[in-house]
Amino acid sequence: MTVEILSKVERAEQVLHDLGIRSCRVRHHGEVARIEVEQGDLQSVIDARDHIERRLLALGFRYVTVDLGGFRSGSLNPHEPTTAS
């Protein structure tokens, strides 16, 4: 990850912090920003979706998504589910 990408993610997370959302992550997937928040903050994100999208698009993301799985530490590269044989 480059310094530029880290800075972009940090600024995107600050947008959420400014809305009072403390436990959050913005995951960088190229043109996509994947937002993770605690389940209790999901409604706040939905209520502010226009503001959040506008701010993250201005940072250079092309798409802004919300991960319905919520905030998970270490979910940048989730493991593939395993199947029993």
Question: What role is predicted for each listed range?
Answer:
Residues 1-85:
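ATP/NTP-dependent adenylation/nucleotidyl-transfer catalytic domains that generate, transfer
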